[in-house]
Amino acid sequence: MDKLSAYTLFSGSSGNCVYIKSADTELLIDAGVSARAVEKALREVGSSLDRITANFLTHEHVDHTRGLEIISKKHHIPTHMTEPSARALITDPHASLLGDLYLHPVLFSVRLGNTTVRSFATPHD
């Protein structure tokens, strides 16, 4: 079995972001702080935004999305989110808020390299 590492870069009402690293894939879960803060935190764990394969958004609250637009567009990182989150986040359907955007049903599974990401329902505090 391949090694999987997870780092909570930021957690709390001021912003959330988790970094996941496997043998051939590096992912973010949420981007609730600025792109600059995410980049700095990634450097501290030996990575960078240039190495991120994709970002998975858990839901549309600002403490999970604050840096999303810049991370997506400037760093060309695909974003995966559920259709309900996209509807809540992107109020103007013609807006180009994000670059590569992949919409999924609430329960989904995505394979990137040797890593599979599966969503699951959980209550929000």
Which residues are covered by each model-predicted region?
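Conserved beta-strand hairpin/beta-sheet module of binuclear metal-dependent hydrolase folds
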Residues: 1-45
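Structured catalytic core of nucleotide-sugar glycosyltransferases
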Residues: 7-17, 59-64, 79, 90, ...
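Beta-strand->loop->alpha-helix junctions that form or flank phosphate-binding loops
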Residues: 10, 54, 101-105
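A generic hydrophobic-helix recognition signal that picks specific residues
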Residues: 23, 52-54, 117
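Short glycine/proline-enriched coil/turn segments at helix->beta-strand junctions
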Residues: 23-25, 74-77, 95-97, 113
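Single, functionally critical "micro-switch" positions that shape active/binding sites
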Residues: 29, 58, 123
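Active-site metal-binding motif and surrounding structural segment of the metallo-beta-lactamase
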Residues: 36-81, 85
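Metallo-beta-lactamase
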Residues: 83-125
